[in-house]
């Protein structure tokens, strides 16, 4: 900061800032000559640098365009593969649905068959039980009829001694015939 203060103080003491129009004093000719020599001597060097930079930029742009084209081709190929994959997925989904329907129908058929077999077994068991019950009832009826017949025969012939005598005589005769 002190340097700036000193500069402004010096400028204020010496009439301020002015434009020097003396070309020889200012060194403007020297600067222009130096710039001219640099341009003349360096144009080949600067031209080759600029040309090299231009080719590098053009090559970079072409590489970028090539990569863009390659990426576009890959994108198109990926989209084709995606479409094919979607078709395959749709086919698999349709086949799965058809297989599921077939399995359900076969399960229904199997269930019907199993139910029919169970029903036939139950019907056969029912008929067997029915026959068994019928035979048991028949035996009970025969047994009851025989008991009642014996009871009636005993009631009819018991008070009568003649029936007892007749029975005993018949038995004795039969024993005699058998011997």
UniProtKB/Swiss-Prot annotation:
Pfam families, per the entry: ATP-synt_B
Subcellular location: Plastid, Chloroplast thylakoid membrane
Leader sequence segment: none
Location (main, coarse): plastid
A GO-annotated cellular component: chloroplast thylakoid membrane
Membrane topology: Single-pass membrane protein
GO molecular function ontology, one term from the record: proton-transporting ATP synthase activity, rotational mechanism
InterPro entries per UniProt: ATP_synth_b/b'su_bac/chlpt (IPR002146)
Keywords: ATP synthesis, CF(0), Chloroplast, Hydrogen ion transport, Ion transport, Membrane, Plastid, Thylakoid, Transmembrane, Transmembrane helix, Transport
Domain of life: Eukaryota
Chain ranges passing through the membrane: 26-42
Described purpose of this protein according to its UniProt entry: F(1)F(0) ATP synthase produces ATP from ADP in the presence of a proton or sodium gradient. F-type ATPases consist of two structural domains, F(1) containing the extramembraneous catalytic core and F(0) containing the membrane proton channel, linked together by a central stalk and a peripheral stalk. During catalysis, ATP synthesis in the catalytic domain of F(1) is coupled via a rotary mechanism of the central stalk subunits to proton translocation.
Recorded family membership: Belongs to the ATPase B chain family.
Miscellaneous section: In plastids the F-type ATPase is also known as CF(1)CF(0).
Complex formation: F-type ATPases have 2 components, F(1) - the catalytic core - and F(0) - the membrane proton channel. F(1) has five subunits: alpha(3), beta(3), gamma(1), delta(1), epsilon(1). F(0) has four main subunits: a(1), b(1), b'(1) and c(10-14). The alpha and beta chains form an alternating ring which encloses part of the gamma chain. F(1) is attached to F(0) by a central stalk formed by the gamma and epsilon chains, while a peripheral stalk is formed by the delta, b and b' chains.
Protein name: ATP synthase subunit b, chloroplastic
Protein's organism: Phaeodactylum tricornutum (strain CCAP 1055/1)
